From Swiss-Prot:
Name of this protein: Platelet-derived growth factor D
Origin organism lineage: Eukaryota, Metazoa, Chordata, Craniata, Vertebrata
Site (Cleavage) location in chain: 191-194
CDD domains associated with the record: CUB, PDGF
InterPro entries for this protein: CUB_dom, Cystine-knot_cytokine, PDGF/VEGF_dom, Sperma_CUB_dom_sf
This protein's record includes keyword Coiled coil: no
Organism in which the protein naturally occurs: Oryctolagus cuniculus (Rabbit)
Length: 300
């Protein structure tokens, strides 16, 4: 119960925090009040992997009777998380660390309660749509009138573009060129376990084009010969063979990916030599009658 000012923090703050922790604080204030959080400037957790806080992170959630909204998930040490005011009189803070030790100070969050009629500051609005920041890219600052962009809506928007340049033009028409240049700038801060060599410039447009161009291509499938040939009175060796069949997530990354299925434009029949067995007595004098090398046809 929040009745005044206080704080929560990672263990041993501002010294290195322990490994393998999962801590949760649920703050509850009086009716018609809200809870305000402010992070200490000594904020430092394990760095993100590919700009996603996978390993060590602190997460803040708004709690109401009908829903739970993630206001943000933070890690790394470059930026201190913003001041947050809850939308209701309940808020949840979660801290997680994995089994990898890092020499970081952790976090300390100061909390207090405010009267419900006080509006949230513009800098606090819509933080539920942000999980981690990408260094070097200047995002449009949210305002009180900006609508919240959900992950599903953002995913649909990204699916409409084929290049990074067009995507950045859509998000930031005025600063897209600067954003594109900053996107590939190397940063000297600590990178974490998955980063060992100097960051190289990745061709995101080529990766996106390859996924769309080659997702639905022939690939090896293992088929059971008795099931494939619909034969129940014989047995084959080998029991299964590899065939080339069309498959894959053909529309991944496009707006119509759920309605897209891979289908072959052309099929060919190929012969395969296998050993066929027929049921019966396998005495030496009758063995030749029960088995034979045969050619079978399979669709590729």
């Amino acid at each position: 119960q929040v009745t005044g000012n206080g704080h929560v923090q990672s263990l041993a703050f501002p010294n290195s925090y322990p490994r393998n922790l999962l801590l949760t604080w649920r703050l509850h204030s009086q009716e018609k009040t809200r809870i305000q959080l402010a992070f200490d400037h000594q904020f430092g957790l394990e760095e993100a992997e590919n700009d996603i806080c996978r390993y060590d992170f602190v997460e803040v959630e708004d709690i109401s009777e009908t829903s739970t909204v993630i206001r943000g998930r933070w890690c790394g040490h470059k930026e201190v998380p913003p001041r947050i005011t809850s939308r209701t009189n309940q808020i949840k803070i979660t801290f997680k660390s994995d089994d990898y030790f890092v020499a970081k100070p952790g976090f300390k969050i100061y909390y207090s309660f405010v009267e419900d009629f006080q509006p949230a500051a513009a800098s606090e609005t819509n933080w539920e749509s942000v999980t981690s920041s990408i260094s070097g890219v200047s995002y449009h600052n949210p305002s009180v009138t900006d609508p919240t962009l959900t992950a599903d809506a953002l995913d649909k928007t990204i699916a409409e573009f084929d290049t990074v340049e067009d995507l950045l033009k859509h998000f930031n028409p005025e600063s897209w060129q600067e954003d594109l240049e900053n996107l590939y700038l190397d940063t000297p801060h600590y990178r974490g376990r998955s980063y060992h060599d100097r960051k190289s410039k990745v061709d995101l447009d080529r990766l996106n084009d390859d996924a769309k161009r080659y997702s639905c291509t022939p690939r090896n499938y293992s088929v059971n010969l008795r099931e494939e040939l619909k034969l129940t009175n014989v047995v084959f060796f080998p029991r299964c063979l590899l065939v080339q069949r069309c498959g894959g997530n053909c529309g991944c990354g496009t707006v119509n990916w759920k309605s897209c299925t891979c289908s072959s434009g052309k099929t060919v029949k190929k012969y395969h030599e296998v050993l066929k067995f027929e049921p019966g007595h396998f005495k030496r004098r009758n063995r030749a009658k029960n088995m034979a090398l045969v050619d079978i046809q399979l669709d590729h």
